[in-house]
């Protein structure tokens, strides 16, 4: 009998992706756990009638906080979002005239292993401009090159991923981000040249 903890799920991450992910996981997991514990404490306090407020003296409340948005992300008046695991919808989203596109890896999909990995593959292929979809009639749709900015939305901080590495749970959000970031490294390098 095979120990289930040693069984690799289908579509397992490559050793290279794991080599990229695991140092990030080990670095950020303690902080993530602290944030999740703080979130639970805040929830308990809110349930007891003590609602949260802003930190006094915070730059966010005194009007001095500013964020510089790069030129390529300035025009975000209209952004389209949808499920990253659905190639047909993602191709359609990428082919709109909207300045922004957000493949959603959490709320728009069921976060089981096949859907999560499909979301990774589709998002990577969309960024690379190679994502296609062929319907039942044999008609193929592909991404038309454009200037649309893509913002991938990973799963939330509170969601774990148990299939990335046998016997070890990692942050779902960090795994999603690492998979897409790692899978599009060549495109990002080319963009800065």
Question: Where are the model-predicted features located?
Answer:
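Short, contiguous strand/loop micro-motifs
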Residues: 76-78
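Active-site-surrounding "flap" and adjacent substrate/cofactor-binding loops of secreted or lumenal enzymes
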Residues: 113, 117-130
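Short loop/turn hinge sites at secondary-structure boundaries
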Residues: 39, 46-49, 129
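Short amphipathic alpha-helical patches
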Residues: 44-52, 116-117
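Long alpha-helical scaffolds
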Residues: 98-99, 119
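Conserved alpha/beta-domain cores
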Residues: 2-27, 34, 49-65, 70, ...
